[in-house]
């Protein structure tokens, strides 16, 4: 069953997308100067084509002429070729009579012709500038009809945000054109999920039944059709309680290029990683719909609003954010603006290659408002762009998107592109992703996030950082912050050795310092320091923006003998203890059902009931809270007694799996979704060799279907054992039934007990059932080997072997931490292969049954 979005487009009146029709007010004429092969500017500063001008592609030329026509006050179109030529293209004024129904007297001859010369360059061979009709004045440009960015039936997208098919909006900082376009789209375009609305609700109900912390809400329109949807699972909601100070609404997937118009709410965790707070399917893009969405998000997050919010510049989103989050600092995603600039400024970048670099530096590397204003004016004047409409609209809205204007607010922006350029679903979702496939990839992305966060937690705890200074402050920070955040703090601290701080004012309690790099004393920063409160403020505002102290404040701390970080400069959200909840151990019971996921869900259900009872009165609340804290202390004692727990290996998550879009175990897939529209990647590292003998013929030993256990034998009883040298494997089918696929494992062990030492092979088979407990036990062993480095683990495999009298055989060997890590990666990959094959076989049999 193929799932798609249905668009019901009605007539759009004057705003209907078409190839013809322009606003025709006052006339505008000028002489054509063709003495510049790279393009010239006319008398009002608009870059125009000229004969001999070169482009790298046809699309690049079209983008240039589109922008030129818009700046001049007319719209253009691609003239279809009746002779089938692929080496010549003509872009003409929309008032041209060629191939149209216009009367000859109304025809306009303005055009540009490009020809393909060689294999790479398109060259302008003809340019007609004069029009036979009036052109739109500057204050009427926003009334020009939107242009199609498709050539005939060619539907290829050549640049993000450029193509504007019917029913789709693209980013524009021009409030007038944006508002007019959005109004028509919102009024006349209706998007629905169609027949999969029922499946979606059933999926949400199943998720909520399994996990009471799962939240979802649906907005209905006047026809009782699903209008917008929001959902968030318990892990996302818990993450918001710790890291919900800054939120980004990523709306790049709303456009019609994507089959699923979803928008994730994302944030940043204590490792600087992207995390998910919730997701929305946006079918109606009106003001009221976004108000509903933000209010629903706030309800799901227990009415805790964010400190800062990042969105696109959509008018409806701006209105909704102002109403629902009045206290939050709201900014526009600068990366959306920069992406749009690739289209709007294509003609300028072609004519002046250095322009793009200078503008980028102006936006991203200026540190004060005055510096930005000066740099912007310099760039605009240098390239004579004072009349460029789009750049002027950008400048008018500068306080909403240029980073320097909101450095006084917290955005958790520790790293340059963090929270802006990327997306939580990068690498998972593309333009062909359907709704059933989306939810499977959504779960895969969630599991990947969970695993990456745990890996970062373990790295922080188990691997001590290398200190670069004798500073007590560095040692303090190393024990407080996560590894990633400490790395940033350490970078700032080391830079203090290259900075000087000179006191320029002192009133007894507050001192003002001038801090500068000794190699660049002309660029200085002002730091004010209050001695009684031990608070410092720097003109760079790095701490206010990111929560990490800058090198300038740290330099002042050095000269004033502040040797450790004051408590108010240690943000809990950046520390290794940012998440207050105690993690549970991950030992797996023999039946395989008492996993961390089941225990977690059960505790969530009990905790919610407990919270509902405890919130009735203040007395009940105090008793409940006291018991929770007391219980937390007891759990901590138990956890310390049994040692660190192994990282959870959730269903569907593979250790070290590198491909994001491949789907792992079948239990990650909602059974209510059909699968015939999904392409699953097939690959096997062992496919290059000859086909191995069938497993049924090999009669290899099988891994016993029981979990592995730790052997606490005293170290002094240890004897020399074989060491693991290599692991190879292959895939075979035992039968045609689902799950009949097994992996044949070949371990090569080097036995030092023999003289001379020799290799020995151990071969056995694993199914997806027996592989899982083995993999989890190995992951636990790997953590135990994390320190000290000279420890080894002794592995004892018990195999079911029909060739022995007892029906069993044992093999014992030892592994180091690095060897076990390589073994883990191979086993995780094998698990993924077994899962993929199982899904394919199930799908194939289902198709046969349908036939």
From Swiss-Prot:
Keywords (A to Z) from UniProt: Metal-binding, Nucleus, Zinc, Zinc-finger
Tissue occurrence: Expressed in hypocotyls, rosette and cauline leaves, inflorescences stems, flowers and siliques.
Domain FAR1: 63-137
Gene induction: Up-regulated in hypocotyls by far-red light treatment.
Transmembrane segments: none
MULE domain residues: 246-342
PROSITE patterns: ZF_SWIM
Localization in the cell: Nucleus
GO CC terms of this entry: nucleus; plasmodesma
ZnF SWIM-type: positions: 525-561
BP GO annotations: regulation of DNA-templated transcription
Molecular-function annotations in GO: zinc ion binding
Family label: Belongs to the FHY3/FAR1 family.
Protein role: Putative transcription activator involved in regulating light control of development.
Entry protein name: Protein FAR1-RELATED SEQUENCE 3
């Amino acid at each position: 069953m193929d799932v798609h979005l249905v668009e019901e487009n009605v007539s759009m009146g004057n705003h209907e997308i078409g190839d013809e029709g322009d606003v025709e007010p006052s006339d505008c004429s000028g002489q054509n100067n063709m003495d510049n092969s790279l393009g010239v500017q006319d008398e009002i500063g608009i870059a125009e084509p000229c004969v001999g001008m070169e482009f790298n592609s046809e699309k690049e030329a079209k983008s240039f002429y589109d922008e030129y026509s818009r700046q001049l006050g007319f719209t253009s179109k691609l003239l279809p070729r009746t002779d089938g030529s692929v080496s010549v293209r003509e872009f003409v004024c929309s008032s041209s009579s060629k191939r149209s129904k216009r009367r000859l007297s109304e025809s306009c001859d303005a055009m540009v012709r490009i020809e393909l010369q060689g294999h790479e360059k398109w060259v302008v061979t003809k340019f007609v500038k004069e029009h036979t009709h009036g052109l739109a004045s500057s204050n009427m440009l926003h009334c020009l009809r939107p242009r199609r960015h498709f050539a005939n039936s060619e539907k290829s997208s050549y640049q993000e945000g450029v193509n504007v098919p019917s029913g789709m909006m693209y980013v524009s900082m021009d409030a007038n054109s944006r508002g007019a376009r959005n109004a028509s789209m919102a009024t006349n375009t209706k998007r629905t999920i169609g027949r999969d609305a029922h499946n979606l609700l059933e999926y949400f109900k199943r998720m909520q039944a399994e996990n009471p912390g799962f939240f979802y809400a649906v907005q209905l329109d006047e026809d009782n059709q699903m209008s917008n949807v929001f959902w968030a699972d318990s892990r996302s909601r818990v993450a918001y309680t710790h890291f919900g100070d800054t939120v980004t609404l990523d709306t790049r997937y709303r456009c019609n290029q994507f089959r699923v118009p979803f928008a994730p709410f994302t944030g940043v965790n204590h490792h600087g990683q992207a995390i998910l707070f919730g997701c929305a399917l946006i079918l109606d893009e009106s003001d009221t719909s976004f108000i509903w969405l933000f209010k629903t998000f706030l309800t799901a997050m227990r009415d805790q609003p964010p400190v800062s919010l990042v969105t696109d510049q959509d008018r409806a989103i701006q209105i909704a954010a102002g109403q629902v989050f009045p206290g939050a600092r709201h900014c526009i995603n600068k990366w959306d603006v920069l992406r749009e600039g690739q289209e709007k400024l294509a003609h300028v970048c072609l004519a002046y290659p250095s322009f793009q670099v200078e503008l980028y530096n102006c936006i991203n590397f200026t540190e004060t408002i005055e510096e930005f204003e000066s740099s912007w004016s310099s760039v605009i004047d240098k390239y004579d762009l004072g009349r460029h409409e789009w750049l002027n609209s950008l400048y008018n809205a500068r306080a909403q998107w240029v980073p320097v204007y909101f450095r006084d607010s917290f955005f958790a922006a520790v790293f340059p592109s963090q929270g802006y350029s990327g997306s939580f679903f990068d690498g998972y979702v593309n333009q062909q992703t359907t709704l059933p496939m989306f939810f499977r990839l959504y779960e895969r992305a969630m599991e990947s996030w969970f695993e990456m966060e745990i890996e970062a937690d373990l790295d922080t705890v188990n691997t001590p950082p290398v200190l670069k200074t004798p500073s007590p402050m560095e040692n303090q920070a190393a024990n407080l912050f996560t590894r990633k955040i400490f790395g940033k703090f350490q970078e700032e601290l080391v830079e203090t050795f290259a900075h000087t701080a000179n006191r320029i004012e002192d009133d007894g309690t507050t001192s003002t310092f001038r801090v500068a790099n000794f190699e660049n004393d002309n660029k200085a920063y002002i730091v004010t320091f209050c001695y009684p409160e031990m608070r410092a403020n720097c003109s760079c505002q790095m701490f206010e923006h990111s929560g990490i102290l800058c090198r300038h404040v740290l330099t002042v701390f050095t000269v004033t003998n502040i040797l450790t970080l004051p408590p108010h400069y240690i943000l809990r959200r950046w520390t290794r203890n940012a998440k207050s909840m105690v993690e549970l151990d991950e030992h797996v019971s023999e039946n395989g059902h008492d996993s961390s996921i089941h225990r977690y869900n059960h505790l969530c259900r009990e905790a919610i009931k407990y919270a509902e009872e405890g919130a009735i009165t203040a007395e009940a609340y105090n008793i409940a809270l006291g018991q929770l804290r007391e219980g937390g202390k007891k759990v901590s004692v138990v956890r310390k007694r049994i040692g660190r727990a192994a990282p959870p290996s959730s269903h569907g998550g593979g250790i070290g799996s590198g491909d994001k879009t491949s789907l792992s175990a079948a239990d990650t897939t909602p059974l209510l979704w059909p699968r015939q529209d999904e392409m699953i990647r097939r690959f096997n590292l062992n496919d290059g060799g000859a086909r191995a003998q069938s497993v049924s013929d090999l009669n290899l030993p099988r891994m016993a279907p029981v979990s592995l256990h730790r052997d606490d034998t005293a170290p002094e009883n240890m004897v020399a054992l074989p060491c693991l040298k290599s692991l190879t494997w292959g895939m075979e089918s035992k039968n045609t039934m689902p799950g009949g696929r097994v992996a044949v494992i070949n371990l090569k062990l080097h036995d030092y007990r023999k003289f001379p030492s020799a290799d020995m092979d151990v071969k056995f088979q694993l199914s997806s059932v027996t592989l899982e407990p083995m993999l989890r036990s190995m992951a636990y062993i790997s953590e135990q080997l994390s320190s000290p480095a000279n420890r080894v683990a002794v592995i004892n495999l018990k195999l079911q072997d029909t060739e022995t009298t007892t029906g069993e055989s044992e093999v014992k060997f030892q592994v180091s931490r690095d060897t076990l890590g390589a073994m883990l990666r191979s086993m995780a990959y094998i698990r993924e292969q077994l899962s993929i094959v199982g899904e394919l076989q199930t799908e194939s049999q289902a198709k046969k049954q349908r036939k």
